[in-house]
Amino acid sequence: MDLQVSDSLKIIQSVINQRKQKYEENGFFLIFWSVLIMLAGVLQFVMLITNYYPKQSGFVWLILMALGFFYSLWIKVKSTKRKKAEKSYNDWTDWLWFVAGINAIIAFLIPWSIFDSFLTAFLIIYLPFTFVTLTMALQMKMKLWIVACLLAFIIIYAVQFISFSQEVFLPLVSSLMAGLLFLIPGIQFHLDYKKRSNVR
């Protein structure tokens, strides 16, 4: 059976639409994580500039990220139980998110290791997430998200040249990165999902 060019394009478009629909429904997770990261960044920044337990300000990240992880895991387990009857395909982008997340967890330890560098941790945390989001943005042909990812790459490398006295602003830059990588597409997915829901 020979496929015509138009048939091939239809198949490709249907795969892209399935992926978009999956993430539109999960647009909640992108928004949830972006808000959580932005909140952690702003809280740590406020603790640092007001000198309110500055050495313990990193625990804000530990607490909020752990809560976010367990909440996400709980939601994922609940949704998996509901979809158990359906045959679900194994999405390779889920594995990319998983690897980037594990990488971020390990990178939290860098400032307390022999590297002793928050800038290195920032690079190691956000670079994989930026690659994952850019991969998805290119696959889904979402121009706004592609631009946000490219801007994130520029910020990641620009941050490496910040002088040590300016590291106090890294939590705010983390908030900006969360907005670029997660909040923008999350809102876009949510709006697309609402449009589709109203049309049906």
Ranges and model annotations:
Residues 21-109:
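Selected alpha-helical membrane-embedding segments in polytopic membrane proteins
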